[in-house]
Structure formats: structure tokens, C-alpha cells
């Protein structure tokens, strides 16, 4: 039974005890009758923000007024020097609240490597993230998103060799150590620490799942990204396998998009297949639009991604 048909059945039939038994049977075979909600990741507008055409403080207004979205995911690089500026954070929060927009998380980059093999550098990286945990709490977010790749100098390159840092298992231990300490700090104020597949071994779903198991804390989790599965150079991990491996730990999901065909489908990712993986894992939270393409301008790319997600949702 399609999830949408399940919802109709659930809302129109309420009278008999026999039906409640039928519903229990259906529910056991339908992992997520609530489907999902859509949010906007600020990186979707990175060129527009970097050009100064819009200001970070107007991000929530764009999400709500231009796209009808009521939840956002911030990127720390767009207010990097404001993490401890209470007046600025207060203005961010007020603007979101006035618009009825939920602040979901802060994506954090350029604060050091949580899995750095140098213990002093690793500790420094952990502590560098504390201010973002505090900022997330102030803004009403549930999480900060961090990276589990081991050296930021290698992240995103085509030539960096992650195998020179240590064994596969050793890199699990290093990343888990930094993540565990940061997660324990966040736990003191109710903030999750979630990891995105974002290059290097973090784009290996099996490896990142092993890191989650090693940390073994209710406040640690993943942010599966549909597209970030390039490990290094031309070495890619299967995106569907990767998302499936990361979904058991997911506290957010990123719908990465680059380009679309004439039917409005993303050409790199089968959104129907991917969203079924997401929903079959029991996930019913926000799925964040993260448009990274160049053929469409950012506003059009965001709208195309939103339209596709809604089309997929209507088909389920």
C-alpha cells in the first residue's frame, strides 16, 4: 500500500474495532506514514551570499517568502565571526521567530579536524566547536553538523591520500575520539553532534557507520547527503548504499542536487529510490534542499529541488 493511501485510509475510517486491527497490520508494513518535511540549507545560496546580493540575516526571509519553507539549516561560514556575538545571534533568532521559521542546525566547517592524528590539534578542534554548540542552543537548533574527515587540507581535493594517515581502523578511532568529546559537551545543553558524509573516509558509508557505533552516544548521529560520496580523486562510494548505511543514525537529511532533466528529475540521483531508502529507515524529519548546481541560478535550482521533493512525496 502506498503511504499516501495509508494516510487517507487512516483519516476516513474510524468506527470499528476490526478496522483498528487492520490498521495495526498495515502500520507494521509501512515504516513512515508521516512522510517528511522540507527545509532549506543555506549553502544552496552560497554564490548569492558571497556576492553580497543577499545578507545572511535575510536567509530566513528568502526561505519563507520565496519558497514557502518554514525551516532552515545555517552554514557557519556566513557568520563565522559572529558565533559569540549575542546581539547578532539575537537578531538572527528574532528574524526567524518573526517569520515562523525553525532553525534546525548549524553546518560547521573550518574549525579543525576532529580526527586529527595529533592529539593537541584534535583537542583544539573539539574546543573550537564549543562556541557553535552554544550558538545552536541560543538559536533553537537541535544540532551542529561537523566533519569526520581527518585533515582539512585533504578535504575536497582530488589528490590527497587519506591512506597515509593510518589504518582504516585507526582512523575510526581518531574520529570517534574527537566526536565523542564534542558530543559529550553538546549533551550538557541538549545539542546533537551530527556528521555529514563530506569527503575522505567520511564518504564511505560503512566507515562512518562504524564511527557512529564506536562513539555510541544518543546525541551523535549522521546527516546523510545524497551526493557527497567522492572519497578521493575518482574513487566514489555507491550513494544509495551509503545513505542506507547512514540512515539508522540520521538526525537530518540533505537532498543534494546539481542538474535536472526535462522531466524535472535530478540527473545524478534517483530521488524516488533515495527517498524510499530514507523513509524505509523510519525517518520523518526534515529533508534539506542543498542545491549545488551551476546550470540553473540558485533560486531556480532551489525551486526545482523543492518541486522534485514534492513530486516524490505525492507519489508515495
Language-model segment annotations:
Residues 1-5, 16-33:
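N-terminal twin-arginine translocation
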Residues 10-14, 18-23, 61, 95-108, ...:
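Active-site acidic/histidine proton-transfer and metal-coordination neighborhood
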Residues 33-35, 60-66, 84-104, 133-140, ...:
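Acidic (Asp/Glu)-rich catalytic clusters
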Residues 33-55:
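Boundary/entry segment of secreted carbohydrate-active catalytic domains
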Residues 36-42, 70-74, 103-108, 144-146, ...:
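Hydrophobic faces of well-ordered beta-strands that scaffold small-molecule active sites
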Residues 50-65, 124-133, 235-243:
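Short, acidic/polar
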Residues 71-72, 170-172, 176-276:
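Acidic/histidine-rich catalytic cores of soluble enzymes
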Residues 73-92, 151-154:
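Glycine-rich, proline-tolerant flexible connector loops at the mouths of alpha/beta enzymes
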Amino acid at each position: 500500500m502506498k503511504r499516501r493511501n495509508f494516510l487517507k485510509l487512516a483519516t476516513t475510517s474510524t468506527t470499528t474495532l476490526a478496522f483498528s486491527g487492520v490498521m495495526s497490520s498495515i502500520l507494521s508494513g509501512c515504516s513512515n506514514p508521516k512522510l517528511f518535511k522540507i527545509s532549506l540549507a543555506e549553502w544552496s545560496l552560497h554564490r548569492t551570499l558571497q556576492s553580497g546580493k543577499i545578507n545572511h540575516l535575510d536567509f530566513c526571509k528568502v526561505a519563507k517568502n520565496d519558497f514557502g519553507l518554514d525551516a532552515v539549516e545555517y552554514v557557519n561560514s556566513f557568520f563565522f565571526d559572529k558565533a559569540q556575538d549575542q546581539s547578532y545571534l539575537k537578531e538572527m533568532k528574532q528574524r526567524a521567530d518573526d517569520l515562523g521559521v525553525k532553525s534546525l542546525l548549524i553546518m560547521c566547517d573550518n574549525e579543525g579536524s576532529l580526527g586529527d592524528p595529533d592529539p593537541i590539534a584534535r583537542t583544539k578542534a573539539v574546543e573550537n566547536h564549543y562556541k557553535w554548540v552554544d550558538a545552536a542552543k541560543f538559536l533553537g537548533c537541535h544540532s551542529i553538523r561537523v566533519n569526520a574527515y581527518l585533515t582539512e587540507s585533504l578535504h575536497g581535493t582530488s589528490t590527497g591520500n587519506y591512506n597515509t594517515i593510518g589504518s582504516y581502523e585507526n582512523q575510526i578511532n581518531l574520529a570517534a575520539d574527537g566526536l565523542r568529546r564534542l558530543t559529550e559537551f553538546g549533551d550538557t545543553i541538549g545539542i546533537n553532534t551530527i556528521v555529514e558524509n563530506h569527503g575522505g573516509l567520511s564518504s564511505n558509508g560503512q566507515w562512518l557507520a562504524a564511527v557512529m557505533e564506536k562513539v555510541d552516544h544518543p546525541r551523535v548521529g549522521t546527516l546523510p547527503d545524497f551526493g557527497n560520496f567522492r572519497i578521493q580523486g575518482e574513487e566514489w562510494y555507491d550513494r544509495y548504499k551509503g545513505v542506507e548505511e547512514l540512515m539508522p543514525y540520521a538526525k537530518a537529511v540533505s537532498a543534494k542536487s546539481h542538474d535536472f532533466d526535462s522531466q524535472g528529475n535530478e540527473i545524478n540521483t534517483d530521488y524516488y529510490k533515495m527517498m524510499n531508502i530514507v523513509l524505509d529507515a523510519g525517518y520523518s524529519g526534515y529533508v534539506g534542499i542543498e542545491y549545488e548546481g551551476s546550470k540553473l541560478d540558485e533560486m531556480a535550482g532551489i525551486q526545482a529541488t523543492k518541486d522534485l521533493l514534492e513530486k516524490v512525496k505525492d507519489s508515495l
